Amino acid sequence: MSGNAALGEAAVLAGCTCYFGYPITPQNELTEYMAKRMPEAGGIFIQSESEIAAINMVLGASVAGARAMTSSSSPGMSLKQEGISYLAADELPAVIVDMVRGGPGMGNISPAQSDYMQATRGGGHGDYKTIVLAPGSVQELTEIVPLAFDLADQYRNPVIILGDGMLGQMMEPVSFDDIKPPKVYQKDYVLTGALGRPSRMVRSLLFDTKEEEEHNWKLFRKYQRIEQNEVRYESYMLDDAEMVAIAYGIGARIVKGAIKRLRQDNLKIGMIRPITLWPFPSKVI
């Protein structure tokens, strides 16, 4: 199964009920798969008129309580950044897939890792963070998707799955047996109509400077909790390592092959593969 298709199926099994996207290579197979599977699963699929529209549809679905997802590739992710900043400021969960291609500019459709800084530093305006997960195989991709939705709901924060064109289009055996039914999170912020309760407001426009400062401190404390609790990484041949390589995603698979070859020459090399690019496993390194 291709990485893009496997990602789509994992999202359906993880309880995704809304998908909004706009075509761009090399993630088109995911959009095509969701166009078929979302109606079958009783969900909503909309091919939006633009990447900007797609991310704002995600915001609308999330504020109504849905598990919502969108996907794109590098130039399209640039267009989504304002909406991602709004999601972070509004504390709304969402899963955003970036199958990275070469850049800058329009670049090309070859796989790349050139969106790393954009994803891990908060690519839009304002000081915010997105949780960033970097799978290294199609099977791991299917395992990361449910985790992404759970982390998004748990922390009320957008989560980015950072893949690349190779991972999205390569074919590998996959199993979905370990995907559990989606967890149910209490979402007391969703806009469902004021049915015998005080009205709710989800907003990021804060004219009062003191109110905005307090809100940003609240976000900062949340980011600290994420850094304390959600660091994930893989250790590879570290027990006797004298040199350690750091690599993530598909690139880490290439590094593993190089390490095996170099160890035949008695070079003691190991690897740390960050699975969360943010929060980054800095203390381990």
Where in the sequence are the language-model features?
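Catalytic-core signal marking the mid-to-C-terminal active-site face
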Residues: 228-230, 267-268, 272-277
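Conserved thiamine diphosphate
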Residues: 110-164
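Redox- and metal-dependent alpha/beta enzyme cores, enriched for Fe-S-associated oxidoreductases
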Residues: 238-267, 278-285
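Short, solvent-exposed amphipathic alpha-helical segments in soluble enzyme
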Residues: 35-37, 85-88, 146-151, 176-179, ...
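Thiamine diphosphate
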Residues: 1-122, 129
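Glycine-rich beta-alpha junction loops
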Residues: 101-103, 163-170, 249-251
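Glycine-/acidic-rich phosphate or pyrophosphate-binding loops and their flanking alpha/beta elements
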Residues: 2-6, 220-243, 256
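Conformationally flexible catalytic loops at phosphate/diphosphate-handling active centers
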Residues: 156-235
